[in-house]
Amino acid sequence: MLTIYHFPQDEAALREQLNRTVSFDPDAQRTVDDILYRVRTEGDAAVLDYTERFQGIRLYDMRVPEAEIEAAYAAADPEFIAILEEAFANITAFHRNEAEKSFFYEQKGGVILGQRVTPMEKALLYVPGGKAAYPSSVLMNAAPAQVAGVDEISMTTPCDAEGKVNPHILAAAKVAGITSVYRLGGAQAVAAFAYGTATIPKVDIVTGPGNKYVALAKKQVFGHVAIDSIAGPSEVVVIADAGAEPEFIVMDMFAQAEHDPDASAVLITPSAELADAVRETAARLAGTMLRGEVITRALTDNGAIVVTGSMQEACKVSDMIAPEHLELHVDNPWEILPDLRHAGAIFMGQWSCETVGDYFAGPNHTLPTNGTARFFSPLSVRDFVKHTSIIAWSKSELARTGEKIARFADHEGLQAHAEAVRVRLKHL
């Protein structure tokens, strides 16, 4: 199930095993192109048609009534509501630390320069539905939008064949202060909010994970709206020393592998003994898991155990992968943290399991995948705000610098640019 590789001897084979290049099939691309075109040109009629085709229900009201949301909240287990509220408080508290302030400063000559930070007006949070429900995705997407000050936060999630939305998702929406909830899923939902219809508002940003059709739709509508990222399958890397607990490592690898057969889980360690113990433990425990077949397939196709010559080499391999989640099961994780650059989130020590970050700790669980942690960041308040430059040039400073600026424009061959300055100089 898990193959052991030795680094650097087996580097080529390891890279082949862990190749996470995203390739969307052409049939899916054509399907999404058709959906986007029809929704853009036909509006609600196309959205309803695709919902009937893909979700098996003819909707007459795409928006979930407030009464249905309130009923789901009232019927929920009070203990679960308390957990949701505490988790949302943790997530919100973390994201408050990301909030940016506008700034202004004065230069010589009475010039004032600055940057104004303003929230987006409307956001859509896409929350996956289907066989699994993820109220945690509601909280994680809503908290930074709320902290940013977004005026209207809409959420959409697929309904079942009877038109019902998972009550736990509705309860989470109530806790998170969502403005409006829609019972739509798939590429047609993304298109509806990206372009707007007679009944669905056009938003400024679409965030949240989904299947390949949702991912393709988000990629296609980027430019009409902002997006957070293109989410891929879940992934975790565990760096561990000889003193790590094998069962902790295995369960953390299983926690990613149970999501999807395409999920990836990798152990990197300088200890050959630990590598053997983890492989044996994984083989023994996989059959005891409810999603054992999915776990086995994921670890066989996309998992690995990597034995390195040193902890420094282990960090090098992790940076090569640039994982979504990185766990450090080592005696002093803070000691090796400076050697690590590329990861969506880093979990420090054996008690900081990735599940804590998924639900409760506070940092966002919407993270870059497929190696994009090299250049992308977790979902944050910054995704829901805009930065506007402020320039207040003074009369005296234009008199001092105007001709220099005009000559700069002359060198670029832009006459009107230069004259826009010179005409003002004549009035000084």
From Swiss-Prot:
Its EC number is 1.1.1.23. It comes from the Bacteria. It is an enzyme of class 1 (oxidoreductase). Pathway: Amino-acid biosynthesis; L-histidine biosynthesis; L-histidine from 5-phospho-alpha-D-ribose 1-diphosphate: step 9/9. One of its GO terms (cellular component) is cytosol. InterPro entries: Ald_DH/histidinol_DH, Histidinol_DH_CS, Histidinol_DH_monofunct, Hstdl_DH. NAD(+) binds at Y126, Q188, N211. Gene3D superfamilies: 1.20.5.1300, Nitrogenase molybdenum iron protein domain. Coiled coil: none annotated. NCBIfam families: hisD. This is Histidinol dehydrogenase. It comes from Chlorobaculum tepidum (strain ATCC 49652 / DSM 12025 / NBRC 103806 / TLS). The lineage of its organism: Bacteria, Pseudomonadati, Chlorobiota, Chlorobiia, Chlorobiales.
